[in-house]
């Protein structure tokens, strides 16, 4: 189903510890273009630490991370999104302004020309079912609506891969099903996905394949 000769994203033998306590040991993961890959593991197993290294918040003590065959530590942090990396943190991360301006504000940073910026904003409002919320301040949105808004913003740069850190956490079952549909919509746009969760069913419903983390590395 997916070409397995050239990963769009690779974690190769990554290790990390805090205060002498190992968090990750020689962790290796591959994501190929267009596929949705899950990382399953309990809270505290290192999933968020892995993503923080991918976006440059932390540095690994050993191993390498590659984005489109380029060592990610050779790509300046502010250019990683232009190289095709998108990231959705677990915590709510929106601006205290309207839904429309939340998307347009990011578009103005990333895209040239006000008409192009407005066009992509309208397109993403449609794609993620946000048109009816466009004038609302993002601070009043529900958990599921916040997730859809964050997904819309991360797609502005048309990333090659999106890292989703526990996007289904603290959501009601019906909202989880709704957000799963939008995760698959991102994949249908041609974007690969690496998504973490501690619930096996949540990943089973969306992932083409999954890695299981335990004892600081992949165990299955």
Spans of model-derived segments:
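Conserved ABC ATPase signature
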Residues: 137-141, 145
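Conserved ABC transporter NBD signature motif
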Residues: 63-71, 83
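ABC-type ATPase nucleotide-binding domains, specifically the catalytic core motifs of the NBD
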Residues: 19, 101-116, 127
């Amino acid at each position: 189903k997916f070409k397995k000769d050239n990963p769009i994203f690779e974690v190769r033998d990554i290790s990390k510890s805090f205060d002498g306590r190992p968090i990750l040991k020689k962790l290796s993961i591959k994501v190929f273009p267009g596929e949705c890959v899950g990382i399953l593991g309990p809270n505290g197993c290192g999933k968020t630490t892995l993503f923080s290294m991918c976006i440059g918040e932390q540095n690994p003590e050993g191993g390498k991370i590659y984005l489109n065959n380029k060592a990610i530590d050779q790509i300046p942090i502010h250019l990683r999104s232009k190289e095709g990396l998108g990231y959705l943190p677990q915590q709510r991360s929106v601006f205290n302004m309207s839904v429309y301006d939340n998307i347009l504000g990011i578009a103005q940073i990333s895209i040239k020309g006000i008409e192009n910026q407005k066009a992509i904003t309208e397109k993403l409002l449609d794609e993620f079912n946000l048109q009816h919320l466009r004038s609302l301040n993002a601070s009043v949105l529900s958990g599921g609506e916040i997730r859809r808004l964050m997904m819309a913003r991360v797609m502005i740069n048309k990333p090659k891969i999106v890292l989703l850190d526990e996007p289904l956490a603290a959501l009601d079952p019906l909202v989880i099903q709704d957000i799963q549909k939008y995760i698959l919509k991102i994949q249908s746009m041609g974007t690969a996905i690496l998504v973490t969760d501690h619930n096996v069913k949540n990943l089973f419903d969306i992932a083409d394949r999954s890695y299981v983390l335990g004892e600081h590395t992949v165990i299955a």
